[in-house]
């Protein structure tokens, strides 16, 4: 609204999780009312869903309008909310949109404790800590798609993990991914991916320089650029200088510098 206290969201009808189940406002309602507002799962309600992005702010209120429309209301203007929703803490959609059909089987409000106990025992979780079982199953962060414990968690990403072994992760194409190209072809194009977890940057660079990888990620070092150019000239690799949100350097401004001109 004009006061930046109400934000209405319109979801995409027909959108599906990677297991084929529809994405609806029930996933939002479950995420807000049964997860974020559950004090055992979240002893402290997340700051970015409080007024003014403050720990002292009032938690938002959710209104479900229909299967694909919902509204979040704050008691004070919160104009930066969309920006925080987009970039804050690399959370992505994971705390506002959860696959309710999957996670309800680990939630005490939907599954009796006696059914949860065998799962808790398998994870060495105390009998009075069902919420720790839930937290091992839910995703709260973008990076957790790489967590083998959460491999069965439905996602909205173009690929999902199918196996892992000794630092090698295998991924398959999400057949329900919501994007298409300009010709209407379903994305992504690539059916399978393999990711190798390499702890040493030097090892990564040596393997990348021989063309062993299709993509070494953002761990590639600019210090090695001259050597990489030589390998590119030899036809072993291709270098693309991507325009990214992350850079190998940063500039921090000192707002309290004593010289008023510089300040």
What is the meaning of each model-derived region?
Residues 2-44, 50, 54-64, 73, ...:
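Extracytoplasmic/periplasmic ligand-capture domains
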Residues 10, 48-137:
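Surface-exposed binding/hinge segments that line
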């Amino acid at each position: 609204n004009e006061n930046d206290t109400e934000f209405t969201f319109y979801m995409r009808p027909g959108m599906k999780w990677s297991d084929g189940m529809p994405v609806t406002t029930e996933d939002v309602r479950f995420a807000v009312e049964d997860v974020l507002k559950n004090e055992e799962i979240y002893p402290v309600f997340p700051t970015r869903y409080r007024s003014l992005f403050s720990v002292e702010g009032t938690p938002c209120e959710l209104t479900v309008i229909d299967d694909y429309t919902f509204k979040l209301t704050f008691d004070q203007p919160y104009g930066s909310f969309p920006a925080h929703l987009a970039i804050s803490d690399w959370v992505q959609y994971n705390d506002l949109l959860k696959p309710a059909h999957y996670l309800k089987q680990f939630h005490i409000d939907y599954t009796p404790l006696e059914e949860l106990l065998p799962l808790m025992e398998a994870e060495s979780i105390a009998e009075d800590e069902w919420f720790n079982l839930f937290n091992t199953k839910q995703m709260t962060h973008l990076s957790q798609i790489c967590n083998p414990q959460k491999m069965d968690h439905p996602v909205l990403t173009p690929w999902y993990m199918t196996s892992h072994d000794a630092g090698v992760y295998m991924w398959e194409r999400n057949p329900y991914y919501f994007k298409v190209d300009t010709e209407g072809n379903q994305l992504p194009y690539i059916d399978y991916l393999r990711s190798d977890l390499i702890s040493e940057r030097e090892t990564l660079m040596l393997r990348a320089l021989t063309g062993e990888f299709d993509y070494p990620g953002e761990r590639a070092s600019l210090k090695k650029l001259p050597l990489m150019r030589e390998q590119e000239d030899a036809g072993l690799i291709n270098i693309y200088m991507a325009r990214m949100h992350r850079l190998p350097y940063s500039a921090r401004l000192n707002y309290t510098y004593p010289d008023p001109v510089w300040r």
